[in-house]
Amino acid sequence: MRTRLWDAASAVYERLLTREIDGAPAHVAVIQDGNRRYAREHGDDPTDGYQSGARTTERVLEWCSDLGVEELTLYAFSTENFERPPDQQQHLFDLLESKLREFADADRVHADRVRIRAIGDTGRLPQRVRDAITYAESRTAGYDGFTLNVALAYGGRDELLTAARGVADAVAAGDLDPADIDAQAIESRLHTSPVRDVDLIIRTGGDERTSNFLPWHANGSEAAVFFCTPYWPEFSKVDLLRAIRTYESRAASWRQTRAKRALALVRALGSEVGEARRVLDRFKGALPDPPEDVEAETQSAD
C-alpha cells in the first residue's frame, strides 16, 4: 500500500515538474556514482550494482532525448578505476563491451539517430573494449539527432596535461608559434574534442564534488551543478527533472545579472553623453566660426 501511494505521488510530482520545464540544457554530463554502495546495501555483489546502474543509464538516455537534451556525457570509467581490484575491472570491461555493442544495435538509437562517441585515453583499455568502441562509433557515425559521449579511461587533470604536452611538442617542433597559443590550441588537443560546453553536471550518490570531470568544458560555460543523494541505480526521472529545474533557475539568474549589467552600462554611457553635450553647449558660443573656404567645401560636399 505504501509503495503504491509513493509511486502515485511520484507520478504526480513528475508531471508537475515536467510542466515547469521551459527548455532543457543542450549538454548534460553525469557522474554515475553509488553503484557499489547500492549493491552493498542490498546484500549484492558489486557486479550486480553495475548491472543495475547500466539499466538506469538506458532510461536516462531515453529521458534526455525525450526532454530535448541534445548531448549527454556519461562518466563510465575514470582513470582512477584502473586502481580497483582486477576482478572488478574485468567485470566493468565486460559490461562496457556488451553495453556498447548493445547500444549500437538498439532500435531506438537508430530511430533517434543517436551518435555514440568514446572520449578519454581509450588506448589504455583492453583490445576487446576498444573493438566495441570502434563498432559503436562506426555504426552511428552518420547520425546527428542526439550525441552520447561515453567517458572511458577519462581524467580531467590527465586530459589537460595531455593537451599541454601536445602544445609544448608542437612549439618544440616549430609547428606552433608561442604567440599563437590560444584557447583553440588547447581545446583541439583535448580527449573530448569536439564536445560542446557543458550546461549541467549531475552527480548521484550524495558526494558534493565534480571529480574533475570535463573541467575545460564545464568552466567554459560555468555549468550548473546538481548533487543528489540517490545512488545511480536509484536515479529517477524526477531527479533528472529537478536537476534541469536547477539549471533553469541558474540560467534565469544569470540572464538577470547580465541584464542588470547592461542596464548599468547604458545608464553610465547615457550620463557621460549627457555631460559631454552640456560641456559642448557651454563652450559652443566661444568656438570660432569655420573659414569661408572650409564652409564652402562642406556645402559642396553636401
From Swiss-Prot:
Note describing how the cofactor binds: Binds 2 magnesium ions per subunit.
Reactions mediated catalytically: geranylgeranyl diphosphate + 7 isopentenyl diphosphate = tri-trans,hepta-cis-undecaprenyl diphosphate + 7 diphosphate
Annotated Mg(2+) binding sites: D33
Alphabetical list of CDD domains matching this protein: Cis_IPPS (cd00475)
Necessary cofactors: Mg(2+)
InterPro entries referenced in this protein's UniProt entry, alphabetically: UPP_synth-like, UPP_synth-like_CS, UPP_synth-like_sf
Pfam family, one: Prenyltransf
Signal peptide boundaries: none
Keywords (A to Z) from UniProt: Magnesium, Metal-binding, Transferase
Active site: D33, N81 (proton acceptor)
EC numbers: 2.5.1.89
An annotated Gene Ontology molecular function: magnesium ion binding
GO biological processes: polyprenol biosynthetic process
Binding-site residues for substrate, renumbered to this chain: G34, N35, R36, R37, S78, T79, E80, F82, R84, R203, R209, T210, S211
Quaternary state and interactors: Homodimer.
Xref: NCBIfam families: uppS (TIGR00055)
HAMAP family membership: ISPT
Function: Catalyzes the sequential condensation of isopentenyl diphosphate (IPP) with geranylgeranyl diphosphate (GGPP) to yield (2Z,6Z,10Z,14Z,18Z,22Z,26Z,30E,34E,38E)-undecaprenyl diphosphate (tritrans,heptacis-UPP). It is probably the precursor of glycosyl carrier lipids.
Protein family according to the UniProt entry: Belongs to the UPP synthase family.
Descriptive protein name: Tritrans,polycis-undecaprenyl-diphosphate synthase (geranylgeranyl-diphosphate specific)
Annotated source species: Halobacterium salinarum (strain ATCC 700922 / JCM 11081 / NRC-1)
Gene responsible for this protein: uppS
